[in-house]
């Protein structure tokens, strides 16, 4: 009799995705982040669901409902901090996952890559709206500043902002709709993840060499299931260490002050994972220009397949491109640092130079270096 996992309609899907899936024999730990992102999404949905049971999306009670969760609900504090720090873990895994894709040329699977970009935008939108919900000072002013950027859109900008706010300022209507969107988006993300995997399994995974590995495949289970399990263990250990020892390490102390529309915090800044984009936004003196640069800082990923000029897929055997890649990583760290600094000399000029370098590296230097490396192959 044939094994049920190969015949049952539902089991068959799971089998082809997790058990009998042919996987390259040489994929490194950099390929672990896909499954880790799945784990992060699962943690966020479960902890978020339990938080939603006790949270109230009203301007008068939102802040105190979060306090109530931490003080009065059984293990509410750990659920709340796992959710808050889980978001940081999510973004760490996301950035490493995207970085892996750039380094090893995974973006040549254009459908998988483009859905990945959509996922990145969706996760960023979800995280932004989630940050507004505790209704602290940084929640309120972050929401005000970021939504107000849409007013830079010509002609319809102001109307659009007021439509999103549900009034003439960030208020009760805004908080309620942000809660609704924050609740529904993770499920849309989960659906997009399925599409992301569907397209990935059409082609199979890339590998560090960037060479087609059809002749050398191994079953996903037990090799990569055990490898993923180790990754899960490490991620959960790291998350719990953060939650139990320094839960507020990555947060902003201003968010422990209830939202006050009459008192602006001295430095309005988003969570750490948005600081690089925030630095790019602030580096352009023009409002519309800044908004365009902000969107392009992520959307630029979509043009990577078009800018791939190398004869090799991966950067594994391309030292010049490798150097530029690591300069790009250092540049992103610089932007993240600048995003958290006040708008004053010398931070302004550093931010402008780092923003210029970011686009210059991706659009000009990296494609040019690939062409040079193609020439070097003939030596």
Curated annotation (Swiss-Prot):
Comment on bound cofactor: Binds 2 heme b groups non-covalently.
GO molecular function, one term: ubiquinol-cytochrome-c reductase activity
Binding-site positions, a ubiquinone: 201
Pfam families: Cytochrom_B_C, Cytochrome_B
A single GO BP: mitochondrial electron transport, ubiquinol to cytochrome c
GO cellular component: mitochondrial inner membrane; respiratory chain complex III
Sequence positions that bind heme b b566: 97, 196
InterPro entries documented for this protein: Cyt_b/b6_C, Cyt_b/b6_C_sf, Cyt_b/b6_N, Cytb/b6-like_sf, Cytochrome_b, Cytochrome_b_C_euk/bac, Cytochrome_b_N_euk/bac, Di-haem_cyt_TM
SUPFAM superfamilies linked to this entry: a domain/subunit of cytochrome bc1 complex (Ubiquinol-cytochrome c reductase), Transmembrane di-heme cytochromes
UniProt entry keywords in alphabetical sequence: Electron transport, Heme, Iron, Membrane, Metal-binding, Mitochondrion, Mitochondrion inner membrane, Respiratory chain, Transmembrane, Transmembrane helix, Transport, Ubiquinone
Residue spans crossing the bilayer: 33-53, 77-98, 113-133, 178-198, 226-246, 288-308, 320-340, 347-367
Protein localization: Mitochondrion inner membrane
Family statement: Belongs to the cytochrome b family.
Other remarks on this protein: Heme 1 (or BL or b562) is low-potential and absorbs at about 562 nm, and heme 2 (or BH or b566) is high-potential and absorbs at about 566 nm.
Subunit and interaction comment: The cytochrome bc1 complex contains 11 subunits: 3 respiratory subunits (MT-CYB, CYC1 and UQCRFS1), 2 core proteins (UQCRC1 and UQCRC2) and 6 low-molecular weight proteins (UQCRH/QCR6, UQCRB/QCR7, UQCRQ/QCR8, UQCR10/QCR9, UQCR11/QCR10 and a cleavage product of UQCRFS1). This cytochrome bc1 complex then forms a dimer.
Role: Component of the ubiquinol-cytochrome c reductase complex (complex III or cytochrome b-c1 complex) that is part of the mitochondrial respiratory chain. The b-c1 complex mediates electron transfer from ubiquinol to cytochrome c. Contributes to the generation of a proton gradient across the mitochondrial membrane that is then used for ATP synthesis.
PANTHER family from the UniProt entry: CYTOCHROME B (PTHR19271:SF16)
Name of the protein this chain belongs to: Cytochrome b
Originating species: Ochotona ladacensis
